[in-house]
């Protein structure tokens, strides 16, 4: 294989590694939990990781209880559950 072909292969492998989300084995287990509004009655806009869509999405949190799949920012959710 020519050096140009090897360079192209290396570039494609690097791009694939950067774009591939973290696997379920590397993701914290709480990322797999459904969002829980908790037992209080506030109506706080929060972010959770949706395992089916592999995206962070909005839900409304009651202010207490719930689980750890509850983030205050999109960046925090993405960094923790989706990957870099």
From Swiss-Prot:
Record-marked site positions (Reactive bond for trypsin): 41-42
UniProt domain BPTI/Kunitz inhibitor: residue ranges: 31-81
Record GO terms (molecular function): serine-type endopeptidase inhibitor activity; toxin activity
Pfam families assigned to the protein according to its UniProt record, in alphabetical order: Kunitz_BPTI
Tissue: Expressed by the venom gland.
Protein family according to the UniProt entry: Belongs to the venom Kunitz-type family.
Main localization of the protein described in the UniProt heading: secreted
Location relative to the cell: Secreted
Protein name (database record): Kunitz-type serine protease inhibitor C2
Glycan attachment positions: 70
Disulfide bonds: 31-81, 40-64, 56-77
PANTHER family the UniProt entry points to: KUNITZ-TYPE PROTEASE INHIBITOR-RELATED (PTHR10083)
InterPro entries attached to this UniProt entry: Kunitz_BPTI, Kunitz_BPTI_sf, Prtase_inh_Kunz-CS, TFPI/VKTCI-like
Source organism superkingdom: Eukaryota
Organism of this sequence: Daboia siamensis (Eastern Russel's viper)
Keywords associated with the record: Disulfide bond, Glycoprotein, Hemostasis impairing toxin, Protease inhibitor, Secreted, Serine protease inhibitor, Signal, Toxin
Role, per record: Serine protease inhibitor that inhibits plasmin and trypsin.
């Amino acid at each position: 294989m020519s050096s140009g072909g090897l360079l192209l292969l290396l570039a494609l492998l690097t791009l694939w590694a950067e774009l591939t989300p973290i696997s379920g084995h590397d993701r914290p287990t709480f990322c797999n939990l459904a969002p829980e509004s908790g037992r209080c009655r506030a109506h706080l806009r929060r972010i959770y990781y949706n395992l089916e869509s592999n995206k962070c999405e909005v839900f409304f949190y009651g202010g207490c209880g719930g689980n750890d799949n509850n983030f205050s920012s999109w960046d925090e959710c993405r960094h923790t559950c989706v990957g870099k």
